[in-house]
Amino acid sequence: MIERVEVMRGGGSALFGSSAIAGTINIITKEPLRNSGQLAHTLTAVGDASAFDNNTTLNASLVTDDQRAGLYVFGQNRYRSGYDHDDDGYTEMPKLKNQTVGFRSYFKTSTYTKLTFEYHHMQEFRRGGNLLNRPPHEADIAEQLEHSINGGGLKFDYFSPDEKHRLSVFSSAQHTDRDSYYGGGKDLNAYGKTTDLTFMAGAQYVYRFDQLLFMPSDLTSGVEYNRDGLEDNMWTTTGIRNKPST
């Protein structure tokens, strides 16, 4: 699935985007070349084996005989019980429940064009503090997060027959829904609700010079649009939402 990872250091470059403060990390994925599948499970004892970390992963790839279309699916399920190292009733490592599922597919519409679509869903639950089997507001100290994340993307690539021109048009979106609790002393006003919708669309054009001045070079240009809508609320005992600035 992953062909290589590129790490570029240093910020302030238009090639990295506005959110890349100290550089960027590019994860270059590869297309599946054959039908395959893998299922794995690991069980890890934490500390004195009073807590266990269970992790199950699954991935599979399907490719047509002419290799014009392919599909890669993946999934993960993880459960780790809370770990209390010094037996004081409070966890040093939180309780975790994670599920991830997604796929990436491609279809080569012609010799020089390709359409790529991907989707992923992540569900995560974290709970730390004490009295993990009780609601968070009944604990002396509790930190609890529950995320539901859905994201996907669509990309169209064109490569010229002489390999000098390359055009990519892409768009992606992700929606995050988070329920949280940060508080102590059985506080009923420490519940929070956060929703976030991020959308991005753009295009990139690359022209390859056989020789520019004294060496081969690439000219890269593009345009990108980003939109991020975040709403963060705290719930009170009266049901009134306090809306901080976002």
Regions found by a protein language model. Give the residues of each.
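Flexible loop and strand-edge segments within Gram-negative outer membrane beta-barrel domains
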Residues: 80-100, 106-108, 112-167, 173-198
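Hydrophobic, lipid-facing positions within transmembrane beta-strands of outer-membrane proteins
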Residues: 23, 37, 43, 54-58, ...
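Membrane-embedded beta-strand positions of outer-membrane beta-barrel proteins
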Residues: 37-41, 71-75, 103-105, 113, ...
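Short loop/turn motifs that connect adjacent beta-strands in outer-membrane beta-barrel proteins
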Residues: 32-36, 64-69, 111-114, 160-166, ...
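Outer-membrane beta-barrel transmembrane domain signature of Gram-negative proteins
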Residues: 145-148, 173, 177-179, 186-246
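Short sequence motifs at beta-strands and strand-loop junctions characteristic
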Residues: 17, 48-52, 63, 93-97, ...
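N-terminal periplasmic accessory domains that precede
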Residues: 1-2, 7, 19-43, 54-59
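Transmembrane beta-strands of outer-membrane beta-barrel pores
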Residues: 43-47, 64-66, 77-81, 121-125, ...
